[in-house]
């Protein structure tokens, strides 16, 4: 092994970006097959490949950052910039969906009866399950902040409790969203209202599932004493991501559920 005279991490070749990209292709193709041909084989293959990739990629990053000490302060600063850019790209991703919604709702076309919501579509009551979902996500934002402050103060017990509550709130939100989809009187095929509603809320729900998985990984790592008060960027990135999901939901609730109804 050659002697390293700098603080940067020279990453070893890894197969996980390739398998991750292939699993994403399999999942999107599998979704198309499921929607049109009611076949879940390709979707299940993509999900399995994606879960295996996540597990092994996270394992390698934990080894490099926690056990081998490659995540120096300089590397952590670069990772922070990377996470900020990633969240910025996610903001632009959701901007497209909000643009589609406002483009259609602010000036409804004659095909929609020049009316919003379109005639025949009965939107969900924003003061029922959507308001409960808003409360759940806002509460999870409080608990993730509690977990972060507990970690900074070296209070491991409180950190684990707060993080577990956040994960459970994320799971509860997902279950409520599934119930809402089941009870909705319209589908993704019901014109521009149905498509913008389900695509926007669906992608947000997917981000909640990803965020919950991220937090669950941090919970397991904290059980194994991986985090300290001054070396915990993995958890910090998960907290940033979770706050981003919270903010997107607030815009989504105010735009689609409350104003759009």
Curated annotation (Swiss-Prot):
InterPro entries: Cyt_c/ubiquinol_Oxase_su3, Cyt_c_oxase_su3_dom, Cyt_c_oxidase-like_su3, Cyt_c_oxidase_su3-like_sf, Cyt_c_oxidase_su3_a-hlx. Gene3D superfamilies: 1.10.287.70, Cytochrome c oxidase, subunit III, four-helix bundle. Keywords: Membrane, Mitochondrion, Mitochondrion inner membrane, Translocase, Transmembrane, Transmembrane helix. Component of the cytochrome c oxidase, the last enzyme in the mitochondrial electron transport chain which drives oxidative phosphorylation. The respiratory chain contains 3 multisubunit complexes succinate dehydrogenase (complex II, CII), ubiquinol-cytochrome c oxidoreductase (cytochrome b-c1 complex, complex III, CIII) and cytochrome c oxidase (complex IV, CIV), that cooperate to transfer electrons derived from NADH and succinate to molecular oxygen, creating an electrochemical gradient over the inner membrane that drives transmembrane transport and the ATP synthase. Its main location: mitochondrion. It is found in: Mitochondrion inner membrane. This is Cytochrome c oxidase subunit 3. One of its GO terms (molecular function) is cytochrome-c oxidase activity. It is an enzyme of class 7 (translocase).
